[in-house]
């Protein structure tokens, strides 16, 4: 079935229930929904109980803004920071039922030591979550990250593979104990996801070929996905065509649960396209994963020398130019 799901934030989502119902009754339920401080569980329980649901909060019980991560990221003791952060998160999680909970959003270290810190932080988050009966959705790196930082402002150069290697212990634990990984993929200045492949779209395949060697490849959700920076500034037809192309690719990969189109709600609201998306998702058959027993299919992400494509350029590429290596 289709692997297209939705990212949902505050704003109009009229028609969501009808969409969920149509897809579920057709035997092709939405694979996944990610929400930010929106209670979607009742809709899923009523219309689409098979849908995987991920929740993230930006507030604590005192209605104070928490943001995307703790203020002591990378500087404080990672275990203590995790304990303090989870103490703020979990009371909100207890009020919002979900299958998985995301403790971080788009924390992208500028130095390799930051990934070492993140691994220790997330390992303690996993300790606390498991002791309290929660499953986590880890990391949620932004589009194009982790990336090669070959000329850092300070510290030593490192590649995306170096970054992933620092995270292997927490990802091994995640896979072993039923947690998942989140990543974001956008077209950015390439405009469409299709044009951005493999520099932005489908870059997870490179990571998963590496992580699988260490049994550190948990199930994956692309929790934000869209042409551009979300459904805005691009024609509906072009955006939908890009969604269908992206879906045709991620359906090939066994590791991918699904993607969450950005977004239902907010300034990028695609609510007017819900009927179109419902028709597409409900009518899309289920192909066998082309990756077979492997987590992902092979992908063209190597340069002429057989090295990973450097991606210092990923945020500055023009819309109609394929970057030089």
Question: For each predicted feature, which ranges?
Answer:
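Acidic (Asp/Glu)-rich catalytic clusters
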Residues: 19-27, 40-55, 89-97, 130, ...
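Boundary/entry segment of secreted carbohydrate-active catalytic domains
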Residues: 1-38, 261, 317
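Aromatic-rich peripheral "rim/lid" segments of glycoside hydrolase catalytic domains that contact
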Residues: 5, 20-24, 49-54, 232-324
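Distinct, well-ordered alpha-helical segments
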Residues: 16-20, 44-45, 145-174, 200-210
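Substrate-binding cleft of extracellular glycoside hydrolase catalytic domains
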Residues: 40-162, 189, 235
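Aromatic- and acid-rich polysaccharide-binding/catalytic face
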Residues: 51, 55-65, 105, 140, ...
């Amino acid at each position: 079935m289709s692997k297209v799901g939705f990212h949902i934030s505050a704003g109009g989502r009229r028609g969501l229930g009808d969409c969920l119902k149509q897809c579920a009754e057709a035997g092709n339920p939405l694979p996944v929904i990610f929400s930010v401080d929106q209670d979607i569980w009742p809709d899923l329980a009523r219309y689409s109980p098979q849908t995987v649901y991920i929740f993230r909060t930006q507030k604590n019980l005192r209605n104070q803004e928490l943001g995307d991560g703790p203020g002591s990221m990378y500087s404080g003791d990672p275990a203590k920071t995790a304990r303090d952060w989870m103490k703020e998160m979990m009371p909100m999680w207890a009020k919002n039922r979900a299958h998985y909970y995301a403790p971080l959003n788009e924390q992208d270290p500028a130095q390799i030591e930051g990934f070492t810190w993140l691994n220790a932080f997330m390992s303690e988050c996993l300790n606390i979550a498991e002791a309290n009966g929660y499953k986590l959705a880890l990391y949620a790196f932004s589009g194009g990250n982790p990336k090669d930082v070959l000329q850092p402002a300070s510290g030593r150069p490192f590649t995306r593979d170096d970054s992933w290697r620092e995270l292997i212990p927490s990802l091994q634990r995640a896979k072993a104990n039923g947690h998942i990984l989140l990543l974001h993929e956008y077209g950015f200045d390439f405009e469409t996801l299709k044009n951005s492949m493999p520099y932005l779209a489908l870059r997870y395949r490179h990571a998963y070929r590496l992580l699988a060697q260490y049994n550190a490849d948990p199930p994956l959700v692309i929790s934000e996905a869209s042409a551009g920076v979300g459904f805005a500034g691009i024609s509906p037809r072009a955006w939908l065509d890009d969604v269908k192309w992206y879906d045709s690719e991620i359906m090939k990969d066994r590791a991918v649960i699904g993607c969450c189109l950005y977004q239902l709600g907010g300034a990028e609201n695609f609510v007017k396209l819900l009927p179109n998306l419902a028709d597409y998702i409900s009518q899309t058959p289920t192909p066998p994963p082309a990756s077979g027993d492997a987590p992902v299919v092979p992908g063209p992400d190597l340069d002429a020398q057989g090295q990973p494509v450097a991606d210092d350029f990923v945020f500055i590429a023009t819309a109609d130019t394929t970057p030089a290596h």
